[in-house]
Amino acid sequence: MKPRNRFEKAVLAESKKLRPISKTQCKWAFRECIDHFAYRLPKGRTTCMDCGHSWTIEKPTDTCTCPHCGARLQVKGTFQRKIRQKQYFTILTACGEYQVLRMFLLSVEMEKGCKTSSYTFEIGQYWWNAQGRKTIIAVQRTLGRYIDTFSFCSPMAVRNDNEAYRHISYSPIYPKFKVTDTLRRNGFEDNFHNIVPTELIPALLSDSRVETLLKSGQIPLLKFFMHNGRRSIDSYWASIRICLRNGYHIEDGSLWCDMVDMLNQLGKDIHNAKYVCPTDLRAAHDHYQTKRRARQERENIIKKRKEAMEAEQAYKQLKAKFFGIEFTDGIIRIHVLESVQEHLEEGTAMHHCVYDAHYYSKPQSLIFSATKDGERIETIEVSLETMKVVQSRGVCNKNTEYHEQILALMQKNMRMIEQRATA
């Protein structure tokens, strides 16, 4: 793709000035980015796949050191003679005023008795100017089953960013960095803190808030925002400034942001150090979570009561002829629920869905409550179509020791319910 503006033209020109990858960098990639094996035969003859040297290991083992090249190897019992490995790696460097992340493919071929042959191929480069503006110089990506299929014969040119280049940018990075003065000034100290370079570098160059978090050592909070989108930082920045002003270190970014959200919902002052700088973050988080849950429960009860009042008239028109039905065997008393409010109270006390599932609005269902000594024991649903008990549930939908007795009492008095239905 041809460069479309001055920025892309300047970057393309600068990319031609980059030095080839050094032998030291290639050696690091070979040593750190791929697996190293010793192939062992059943009788103990072992071959280092790095240098081709053979020796005998009497007893099976998981790892060993090659006596010839000193490589630390994983011992693998196999008759295989060849192995091929590929791995991406990256190098952070600077070119003129630009920060550059170079991406390489390391391809290694190993064969028994031979020294390893390897080569590196440059896939592409991420370029950023001092303001964090980005462009990509890379080989062309081709269509295929895998995201990282490239046309290695294509020229290095300006490309659109895509998942293939982003995928490679997550690869291991050479530990010796060369950075621009601007990036160094903005707080970068040769540590990405497990944040992808393609996310941290442009953020650090373009967003002063990221610079502030990095310089103040608020790394857990910085990682949280980088992993969850920097847009959300706006909602918390005023509270973050309170923490910075009071020298408060946020040990868990996710937990702290959750706590601030809960404080906001509870109507607390999130600009007050008393709330946003707790001595024990986890204890404070759990405390406000409990308070928010209690508030939500109160709001739900109010909402349900309002719904019950609105549904009350319709329920009376639908089931009024059954009101007053009550029977007992001397131990258990069973009566029909005569209002939506009673359905709400029954569902709350018994911890089931008789109210939430709107049983009061079902024209062919009639709900009864079974009690013993004034305490609820089971809730019964009767079908007005079949005049049979559909279900009878105790607390948390479990059957009680009185379950069969309740069913027998319901069956004995089903004629009374049927008479009311036909009246």
Placement of each model-derived feature along the sequence:
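Catalytic-core elements of nucleic-acid end-processing and repair enzymes
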Residues: 209-210, 214-423
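Sequence-structural signature of the catalytic-core scaffold of metal-dependent phosphohydrolases
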Residues: 1-312
